[in-house]
Swiss-Prot record:
The keyword Signal does not apply. The modification Phosphoserine is found at residues 100, 102. This is Large ribosomal subunit protein P2. GO terms for cellular component: cytosolic large ribosomal subunit; cytosolic ribosome. It comes from the Eukaryota. The keyword Ribonucleoprotein applies. It comes from Drosophila melanogaster (Fruit fly). InterPro entries: P1/P2_N_sf, Ribosomal_P1/P2, Ribosomal_P2. GO terms for biological process: cytoplasmic translation; cytoplasmic translational elongation. Residues 86-99 have a biased composition (Basic and acidic residues). Residues 73-85 have a biased composition (Low complexity). P1 and P2 exist as dimers at the large ribosomal subunit.
Amino acid sequence: MRYVAAYLLAVLGGKDSPANSDLEKILSSVGVEVDAERLTKVIKELAGKSIDDLIKEGREKLSSMPVGGGGAVAAADAAPAAAAGGDKKEAKKEEKKEESESEDDDMGFALFE
C-alpha cells in the first residue's frame, strides 16, 4: 500500500511515469524502508494506468471484500441471555454500546503497511 500511495503522490506531483528513485525519495522522506523488489513490481503493475482507473479498481476490490462483524453479533446475542431476568432496556443499551465501539475498528487495513 505504501508503494501505491507513493506512486500516486509522484503522479499527482507531475511525474507521468515515476521511476524507482522518485518513489524512494518520497518514501524515505517519511522514514519508510524501501524493498526494491516490491517497488519495481508496483511500478511495473501501475505503469500506463491513470489514477482514475486505479481508484476505480480499488473501490471495486474493496466493495467485494467481506467485512467482519460475526463476532460482535454473537457477543450481542449472548449478552441478553446472560442477563436472564434482567431489564430489557439495559440489555439494549449494552448492545448499542458494543456496536458503536466496533465502528471505531480499522477493519484490518493499515494505510502504510
